[in-house]
């Protein structure tokens, strides 16, 4: 099995798992996985595809500029430049971007603060943080319509081989050293978002102690 085929199957499996969670509303979201380092190439989801379905045109191979390596009628996902920034600046092997209701709500609630922090949740250990009173933060950036501008702002927060950024009223982009790590981190962040949204709703309908995220 060639490396390209292996990576394709890895990304297809992740796409199927995330689709089963209904995280690809209205063809939104984009996924990528690195294939080679030198030259840099990676598979990225094709634009406008229904990600609940599996086809032979789900992904295309692009270069370090986000352009298709071969002639194709397919177009890379709109936010491919964000994936480019990740692979250029880090040793990450996979990047996942999804639009969920919970991550959009959280990004709007805390968008003016530029970040949101969570503590006191066991799931934080998924990030390799084992301290009892650990706090984890995720930056929130504006949702610039001009993708090069968005990518430039996004790049300011790409500082390690694993990380995450929330784009306000848009979605979350998570990256990791490999596909397993990226998916694990995405699941952990979405758990935290969902927990906090539900906690806020409960506070509106019952007498509960005030707990900050």
UniProtKB/Swiss-Prot annotation:
It comes from the Bacteria. Belongs to the aldolase class II family. MtnB subfamily. Pathway: Amino-acid biosynthesis; L-methionine biosynthesis via salvage pathway; L-methionine from S-methyl-5-thio-alpha-D-ribose 1-phosphate: step 2/6. Keywords: Amino-acid biosynthesis, Lyase, Metal-binding, Methionine biosynthesis, Zinc. Catalyzes the dehydration of methylthioribulose-1-phosphate (MTRu-1-P) into 2,3-diketo-5-methylthiopentyl-1-phosphate (DK-MTP-1-P). It comes from Geobacillus sp. (strain WCH70). This is Methylthioribulose-1-phosphate dehydratase. GO terms for biological process: L-methionine salvage from methylthioadenosine. It is an enzyme of class 4 (lyase). Its EC number is 4.2.1.109. The keyword Zinc applies. One of its GO terms (molecular function) is zinc ion binding. The lineage of its organism: Bacteria, Bacillati, Bacillota, Bacilli, Bacillales. The keyword Transmembrane helix does not apply. It catalyses: 5-(methylsulfanyl)-D-ribulose 1-phosphate = 5-methylsulfanyl-2,3-dioxopentyl phosphate + H2O. Binds 1 zinc ion per subunit.
